[in-house]
């Protein structure tokens, strides 16, 4: 692992976690870092904080969210993102994406780490 991505086991569920408040992915193309960490830990779950993601992730027109989510889906990795509810910079289209994602079980955005971990454990 690295100092930015670590395997954390809680309640029998192992997930790769990003370091809170630290940038991990500068671009969508760097999602391989998350996949490599998952493969090394033998897990299929990741918990990242909004600050770990590319700055434009929550602006759907950037393509970052789509590229990252598709790559993780291709490998069966579930992603939980912790983001304050009041955080700005979310496009209208991202809200539409979240409405669609609620019908799936491989991506979610949560207000707290505890909520994100509970979802990954479900």
List where the protein language model places each region.
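Amphipathic, Lys/Arg-enriched alpha-helical "gate/interface" segment within cytosolic domains
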Residues: 2-122
């Amino acid at each position: 692992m690295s100092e930015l991505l670590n395997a954390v086991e809680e309640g029998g569920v192992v997930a790769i976690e990003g370091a809170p408040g630290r940038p991990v992915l500068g671009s969508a193309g760097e999602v391989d870092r998350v996949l490599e960490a998952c493969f090394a830990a033998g897990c299929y779950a990741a918990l990242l904080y909004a600050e770990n993601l590319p700055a434009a992730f929550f602006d759907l027109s950037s393509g970052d969210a789509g590229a990252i989510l598709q790559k993780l889906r291709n490998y069966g990795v579930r992603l939980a993102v912790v983001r304050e509810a009041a955080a700005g910079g979310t496009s209208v289209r991202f809200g539409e994406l979240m409405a669609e994602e609620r019908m799936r079980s491989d991506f979610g955005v949560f207000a707290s780490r505890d909520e994100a971990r509970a979802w990954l454990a479900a």
